[in-house]
Amino acid sequence: MAFGIRRAYPTPIVKPLWPYAVGGVITFFLFAKAANASMNTEEFINDPRNPRFKAGGVKEEH
């Protein structure tokens, strides 16, 4: 018996799973876009946790 020899089975991995990968990428970018839009609202623009606030790009109120 040959225990060290592996047999290559033609199992499709990428073909049935590509819709999930594409959906994951789309979801990631939609959440990133929503987070950026939320960071730039009036409610969160002057929050000290905002990266734009730390960089000195604070929106001044008139």
Swiss-Prot record:
Endpoints of the signal sequence: none
Chief subcellular location: mitochondrion
One cellular component (GO) term of this entry: mitochondrial inner membrane
Regions that span the bilayer: 13-32
Biological processes annotated in GO: mitochondrial proton-transporting ATP synthase complex assembly; proton motive force-driven ATP synthesis
Topology class, membrane: Single-pass membrane protein
Protein name: ATP synthase subunit J, mitochondrial
Organism expressing this protein natively: Yarrowia lipolytica (strain CLIB 122 / E 150)
Assigned keywords, A-Z: ATP synthesis, CF(0), Hydrogen ion transport, Ion transport, Membrane, Mitochondrion, Mitochondrion inner membrane, Transmembrane, Transmembrane helix, Transport
Record bears the keyword Transport: yes
Family per similarity comment: Belongs to the ATPase j subunit family.
PANTHER family attached to this UniProt entry: ATP SYNTHASE SUBUNIT J, MITOCHONDRIAL
Keyword Transport: yes
Location in the cell: Mitochondrion inner membrane
Quaternary structure (record): F-type ATP synthases have 2 components, the catalytic core F(1) and the membrane-embedded component F(0), linked together by a central stalk and a peripheral stalk. The central stalk, also called rotor shaft, is often seen as part of F(1). The peripheral stalk is seen as part of F(0). F(0) contains the membrane channel next to the rotor. F-type ATP synthases form dimers but each monomer functions independently in ATP generation.
Single annotated GO MF: proton-transporting ATP synthase activity, rotational mechanism
Function: Mitochondrial membrane ATP synthase (F(1)F(0) ATP synthase or Complex V) produces ATP from ADP in the presence of a proton gradient across the membrane which is generated by electron transport complexes of the respiratory chain. F-type ATP synthases consist of two structural domains, F(1) - containing the extramembraneous catalytic core, and F(0) - containing the membrane proton channel, linked together by a central stalk and a peripheral stalk.
